[in-house]
Amino acid sequence: VPPSQRLLRAAEELFGERSYWRTTVADICARAGIATGSFYAHFDSKAEIFGAVVRQINEDLRKAIRAALETAGSGQRARERASFRAFFTLLSQRPWIDRIVREAEFVAPAVFREYYEHLTRGYARGVRQAQLDREVDARYDPEVIAYMYTGIGNFIGMRWADWTAGGQVPDDVVDDVLEVLRRGLPPLGPPARHVSS
């Protein structure tokens, strides 16, 4: 594994465990098994490697979603399920990544914004295609829907994967998310299957 990748992996783990502010370059180098002086051959600062970690998380997530979509089958609902499941699976494997991205809002605001712009751009393209295929109501702005998907995914993932230190988001939770996306929140309807307290 190249030294830069070892540093990125170590930095991701430490930023997730301790936060940006409580992690030092020396900590990252010790975890990576690399001399502290060698760090600066790859990154100029702790801030730079933090931005690189957030970008790597974004790339890993988009790659996981693309792979899931290749086997998702046809139809918007199948693609939505595959996308959510890919995110939740990555989050269960690396539950700290959501904390790192949230911290980026304050540590590296431009990187934080870039993260969500890249992520939602892909979702919006998928929604627009679903609108053209008449699977999603074309009256709604694809960007709005993309940010809704992202917000839902973030908070569901935080609750079931991050807060449980790597737990899986249950299938019935994913089913509920997809049903709400499909039907909205109508004022009347059949009784809910369950109510969480």
Protein language model features and the residues they cover:
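Generic hydrophobic, amphipathic alpha-helix propensity
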Residues: 1-11, 28, 49, 53-65, ...
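Helix-turn-helix
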Residues: 6, 14-48, 52
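Conserved hydrophobic residue
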Residues: 20, 136-137
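Hydrophobic alpha-helical connector segments
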Residues: 52, 63-94, 142-149, 171-174
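Amphipathic alpha-helical packing segments from all-alpha helical-bundle domains
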Residues: 59-62, 90, 108-135, 143-147, ...
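Amphipathic alpha-helical segments used for helix-helix packing
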Residues: 86-110, 155-162
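C-terminal effector-binding regulatory domain of bacterial HTH transcription factors
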Residues: 185-197
